[in-house]
């Protein structure tokens, strides 16, 4: 029997299927079609003002507000003529009280051999989804409670809930069975509610800045916009090799050429590469492009966007605590403006190396003595490539506060304009870092079609000399679009998953993805 169906042999599953059969024999449908006109538990809580509610006696007289809601039964205990439970929905829990003489089970025949309270005690289980009609009151201890008038079984659960104290202790099980993780852990629910809120706030900010949200193809005949290995598939209808996109960039720039002056897309990107604490092969990005901007305008947009999101999440505060660095917990302030440094300045400040004072041979020696990189990583590297390697190895993990690192070597990208100062060895690119990780990548976008072709062809020549590089053709449609004329523009890309990690104090990217990529469990 395969691992996926082992639960079919669990004693609890078998016991609950017997209950399911008995419930059906009583004439009750354990999986009804709908439960209309119910509200969220949090909405009920928001309505309540202490002095508006009476005690349980007032509820029994039906003098308190009546409510109708639904959720999962996550706690239950019998106490004589009463039984108490907790109902959990998306945002909140609420206590319910079943009473022997007052509470009824929807659909239970009047002449049934089992009473409503016995049905509740014997046929319902933790994990069942219930509809509740009842009356609000406060207990003597001050807990908001619903005296149940009618309970409706909306879904009979056949698998027991995770232990209420330890939840799902095994991380791999948590990631594979996220539904159970969400039920058992309030912190996990908060993380994913925050993720949805972050996406909403990003869209809100971009819309305020007059950006137009667009959609571009996930399946592409030519991939580009980043240095990454794609996932490859075949479109059977056209007998054509296709790729899952590794970036949103090229398609968005084509739209910019078409006259849509400010565009953004939030979407899935796929890279057939490693999996670690901050990388998943399938991840979510926002990329945005604005005509007539340069990378200075983009820097302001990025830091203001992130500050806007952080303030909305944290009641106006811009400081966030992150607990999962090797150096211990850190407080990070996302208030704009962020620290700005050129890449060379950052290597000098954080790495103690003034790269302009060293020859290429000396830079290789520094890489050999001060990093753990294999010799093949730098033995034939250009000066610009070695500067980028020194930054990666000596600087990145020291950038705890938000930084914009500007003016990268030309070799790092073929899609960016060189410095307007005339130094053609550097480009108007910045990357934003926080908590030792890259958060954003941005350019003053190259719109000279002849220079763009030259740089892409040079990139192809270098790849041809490197047996570890994967060849892929130049996107001629993109170059044709540039020939049509793309306005000067600034653009950026932000990894949404990494941003959510930072703002929810998550240790791993898997903690902010509902269903991260996992190794397949083979049949036994």
From Swiss-Prot:
<keyword id="KW-0547">Nucleotide-binding</keyword>
<dbReference type="InterPro" id="IPR004364">
    <property type="entry name" value="Aa-tRNA-synt_II"/>
</dbReference>
<dbReference type="GO" id="GO:0000049">
    <property type="term" value="F:tRNA binding"/>
</dbReference>
<dbReference type="InterPro" id="IPR004365">
    <property type="entry name" value="NA-bd_OB_tRNA"/>
</dbReference>
<comment type="similarity">
    <text>Belongs to the class-II aminoacyl-tRNA synthetase family.</text>
</comment>
<dbReference type="InterPro" id="IPR006195">
    <property type="entry name" value="aa-tRNA-synth_II"/>
</dbReference>
<comment type="subunit">
    <text>Homodimer.</text>
</comment>
<dbReference type="GO" id="GO:0005829">
    <property type="term" value="C:cytosol"/>
</dbReference>
<dbReference type="Pfam" id="PF00152">
    <property type="entry name" value="tRNA-synt_2"/>
</dbReference>
<feature type="binding site">
    <location>
        <position position="431"/>
    </location>
    <ligand>
        <name>Mg(2+) 1</name>
    </ligand>
</feature>
<keyword id="KW-0963">Cytoplasm</keyword>
<dbReference type="GO" id="GO:0006430">
    <property type="term" value="P:lysyl-tRNA aminoacylation"/>
</dbReference>
<dbReference type="InterPro" id="IPR012340">
    <property type="entry name" value="NA-bd_OB-fold"/>
</dbReference>
<keyword id="KW-0436">Ligase</keyword>
<feature type="binding site">
    <location>
        <position position="438"/>
    </location>
    <ligand>
        <name>Mg(2+) 2</name>
    </ligand>
</feature>
<dbReference type="Pfam" id="PF01336">
    <property type="entry name" value="tRNA_anti-codon"/>
</dbReference>
<dbReference type="GO" id="GO:0005524">
    <property type="term" value="F:ATP binding"/>
</dbReference>
<dbReference type="GO" id="GO:0000287">
    <property type="term" value="F:magnesium ion binding"/>
</dbReference>
<dbReference type="InterPro" id="IPR044136">
    <property type="entry name" value="Lys-tRNA-ligase_II_N"/>
</dbReference>
<dbReference type="InterPro" id="IPR002313">
    <property type="entry name" value="Lys-tRNA-ligase_II"/>
</dbReference>
<keyword id="KW-0030">Aminoacyl-tRNA synthetase</keyword>
<dbReference type="GO" id="GO:0004824">
    <property type="term" value="F:lysine-tRNA ligase activity"/>
</dbReference>
<dbReference type="InterPro" id="IPR045864">
    <property type="entry name" value="aa-tRNA-synth_II/BPL/LPL"/>
</dbReference>
<keyword id="KW-0648">Protein biosynthesis</keyword>
<keyword id="KW-0479">Metal-binding</keyword>
<feature type="binding site">
    <location>
        <position position="438"/>
    </location>
    <ligand>
        <name>Mg(2+) 1</name>
    </ligand>
</feature>
<dbReference type="InterPro" id="IPR018149">
    <property type="entry name" value="Lys-tRNA-synth_II_C"/>
</dbReference>
<protein>
    <recommendedName>
        <fullName>Lysine--tRNA ligase</fullName>
        <ecNumber>6.1.1.6</ecNumber>
    </recommendedName>
</protein>
<keyword id="KW-0460">Magnesium</keyword>
<keyword id="KW-0067">ATP-binding</keyword>
